[in-house]
Each structure stands twice: as structure tokens, then as C-alpha cells.
Amino acid sequence: MIRFLCVFLIFNLFVRSSSAQQKRYNAAEIRLNLEKLNTLGSVLYVAAHPDDENTRLLSYYANEKHFRATYISMTRGDGGQNLIGSEQGELLGVIRTQELLAARRIDGAEQVFSRAVDFGYSKNPEETFSFWNKDSILADVVWAIRKVRPDIIVMRFPTTGEGGHGHHTASAILAVEAFKAAADPSRFPEQLKYVQTWQSERIFWNMFRPKEEEVKGKPDITGVDIGSFNYLLGKSYGELASESRSMHKSQGFGTARSRGKQLDYLKLIDGTPFLDNELSGINTTWNRVKGGEAIAADIQKIIASFSEVNPSNSIPALFELRKKINTEIKDDYWKNLKSKEVEELILACGGFYIEAFADISSVTPGEQIKITASVIHRSDQRFTLNDVRFNDQDSVLNSKLEQNI
């Protein structure tokens, strides 16, 4: 194992964690992520607080549909209750942020936030916006849409107040406004130095367990079976979602594993009408980008030849795939996203263990800290560790990594 030290100046007031590790995948999860490579789809889920999200729907889109699934929470939940400790306010927000991140590591979705502050219960959206700077929070939602480029947007709450909390209704109002604003170059043009405008195809409200007569025969409502079983994970999405939701420990959450068919309903709020389901007419294959057809064929070959007992056999083909994506795909969004996914798969197939940790948990500006990093690979492929970077510090190593050492 190669160990190295690096001393550098830290400019943050707080180091988030004294230890950092990459996620490690078993062979079935590697296979699942190989299949995700062949899907170019994105969904954004919008709500107000940690624990507002529908973890079943997020699990379904991330693992069944193989989408990039993202949850944007308007707040970090710092105005809520704490059932596991005495932390309140900002410190509770830190705890609930980590609970959300832990939930996403289980259900496979991504997590982002706006700058909105959870100031406690709010009677209506007007009161909420009197505390929040509406334009600033709207800019955050627009940024999220332009950043993750969702094909569809799903709101947890309606704009009409049935959510029972001003924050809930405000999150829906912001989502509907951002749906159009993200495609308008005159709205928040300062963002366009970094992202492009984006028009999602549709925006839906994720309905609250409606009665059959409320949804039957309605052309603007579609049902999604989120209870299907994933053989690679050995779990249904209801089971996966219950594990994810149980991460909200400060709120006393812990839900029983649900199994069997479960329908969630989506009501179209804006966007193009659909025929069969919420994704009708949306191309989520590599054909949506120029040069993608050949990439799809290469990925299919890698999947067909994948060995569960020796995933490292796929590494040479993954390196070639990464090179091909970077040279032949001109759409920067999908090129960067899929190239990163391939890099993560190479690390997973190589059995890499990468860890970095600091000797202290927090520092003040100008202080020095010692960072220790460890790298080990456990495959029969040959790797060289070229350099290690911490922020703007670069250590050139050019060291060969021996197997399992």
C-alpha cells in the first residue's frame, strides 16, 4: 500500500469530515452501473425539507429506469425537531444534511440544496416568501435544473396548499416557475457562463395516495409501479426505499419494508401531453447525442462479456470506452457525466480502496493540517498512480501499484 503525506493551507472554517472514502461496489452493483451507462435520462424531485422526498420513486428512477435521479431540498431542516440529541438550528441542519446524504447513498439518487433557511412552521407560502428571498431561491432551483438537465421534474407537493405547510407549497410554486425560467436566457443570465438553458419536457405533482375515482381515465394522470423487484440488488424498490428513509434518525423515522405492487400517481402540471406514461416520447438512449450509437454498442459488448467473478476483465474495454466518449461525444453534459461514471466503474472493477483523512476534525483559516491518503488496488490489472491532488496542491508520484499491497 502506498502512503503519502501532504501539508497545505485550508481556507474553510470547517472540514466536513476527518475521513473520506469512496463508495465500494459488489459485482451485482457493478453490473447495475454498467447498465446505467446505456441510459441518458434525468429526473429532478423537488420538495422543501429533508425527509419530504419520496424515496420509493427516487429508488425506482435511479435503479429501475437507470436515470440520473436528483432530489433538491429547499432547506436543510434546521427548523425541525431533534429526537436523537440536543442540537438545534444550524447544528441540526448539519445532522439532517448528513442524513439526506446517507439516504442517497442507499437509494442511488443525488442530493442538492437551495440556500433557503428552515425557520420553522409556516402557515402559507406568502409568509414563507417573506422570510426567504424568493428570487434567490428561484435562482437556486433554476441552477439545479440547468445543471442536471432533467427530462421531467416531479414535485412532492401541489401549489394549491394541500401540503399543510408554507414551505411545502412554496417549493411547488418555485418548481413551476423554474420549469419555464430555466429555459429563458433572460432569467439569471449570470448562470450561463457555467451552464446552458434547459427546458424539461414535463413537470408533475406526485399525488398523495388518491382514490381510484380521482385517477381513473384521467389523461393528465399516470401511475408508476414502484414496487417492482430488482434481482441485482435482491430487493424491491419499496424495501430499498424503507432503508433509505430510515436514515432520517433525528426525526424518528424508520419504516417497515414494503413489498409487492405499489402505484404512485403523477399529475401533469405543465409541459407536453403524454400518451402512455410520464416518459412518453422522451429519448433516453445514446441516440439522443451525436455519435452515441457506436458508444451504445460498445457498452452492450462490455455488459455481455462482464464476469461477476472477475470484474477486472472489463477494465481495458472501459478505458477504451472512456477515450471514445471523450473524443467522439460533443455534448459536454453527457460526455462529462458518462466519462465520470466510467471512471467510477474502472475503480470498482479494480477493487480500489482509496481513503484520505485529516489528523484533526476542524481548523481555522491559515492553519495547517496533515492529510494521509491510502491507495490499494486488488485486481490483476496494472495501474500507475501518477499524482495526488488536494485542492490546488499536486503531488507527482508516478508509482506503480502492486496488486493488493
Language-model segments: what does each one mean?
Residues I376-Q381:
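Short solvent-exposed strand-capping/beta-turn motif centered on an Asx-Ser/Thr pair
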Residues R389-I405:
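Intrinsically disordered, low-complexity Pro/Gly/Ser/Thr-rich segments with frequent PxxP/GP/PP motifs
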Residues S361-E367:
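Short, solvent-exposed loop/linker segments at the N-terminal edge
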Residues A20-K147, T169, I173-K180, D184:
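Active-site rim/loop-helix segments in enzyme catalytic domains that contact anionic ligands
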Residues A356-I360:
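Surface-exposed, proline-enriched loop/turn segments that connect beta strands in immunoglobulin-like
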Residues Q22, E29, A181-Y353:
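The feature marks non-catalytic terminal segments
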Residues M1-Q22:
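Bacterial Sec-dependent N-terminal signal peptides
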Residues I369-I371:
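Structural beta-strand segments of beta-rich domains
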